[in-house]
């Protein structure tokens, strides 16, 4: 009987151990640094940041409860300073909130903190990542334009509008 009790306690402890680890992680305040190349009163920038915070909240991450979002609004002359400030805070991740203009200063500020970018036209051409499939380094993100898809886009255009003989891209 003692052997069964011991095995029961051991099994219960083994089953509960991962739950204790998860509980400890939830107590740790996570930190996100956001660099925006916009004025702090820019309506579009505020809307983007609000949407980001709302999406995080839906996933259980609430600013002030288990997450801290540090945002810096930068202009051309002080973007490097703001990127360095954010990197010095040692966040869990940095968000380059307004595309190409914010990625380069963040990469100059840190090569260890993960950087996530949004709406960068050509991250490979800009030297932010090695490739889209395997970015390497500490930067990754979303591109709004993939040059290798140009042929497919023209093929689809021809299929949708066979009478079109010329197309221009701006």
What are the functions of these language-model segments?
Residues 1-170:
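Short hydrophobic alpha-helices and adjacent helix-cap/hinge residues
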């Amino acid at each position: 009987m003692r052997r069964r009790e011991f095995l029961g306690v051991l099994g219960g402890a083994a089953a509960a151990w991962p739950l204790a680890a998860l509980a400890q992680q939830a107590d740790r305040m996570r930190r996100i640094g956001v660099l925006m190349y916009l004025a702090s009163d820019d309506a579009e920038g505020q809307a983007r940041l609000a949407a980001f915070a709302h999406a995080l909240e839906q996933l259980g991450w609430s600013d002030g409860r288990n997450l801290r979002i540090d945002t810096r609004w930068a202009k051309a002359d002080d973007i490097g300073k703001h990127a360095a400030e954010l990197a010095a805070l040692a966040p869990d991740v940095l968000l380059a909130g307004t595309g190409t203009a914010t990625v380069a200063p963040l990469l100059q500020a840190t090569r260890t903190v993960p950087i996530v970018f949004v709406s960068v036209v050509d991250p490979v051409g800009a030297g932010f990542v090695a490739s889209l499939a395997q970015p390497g380094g500490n930067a990754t993100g979303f591109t709004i334009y993939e040059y290798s898809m140009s042929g497919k886009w023209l093929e689809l255009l021809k299929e949708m509008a066979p009478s079109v003989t010329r197309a221009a891209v701006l």
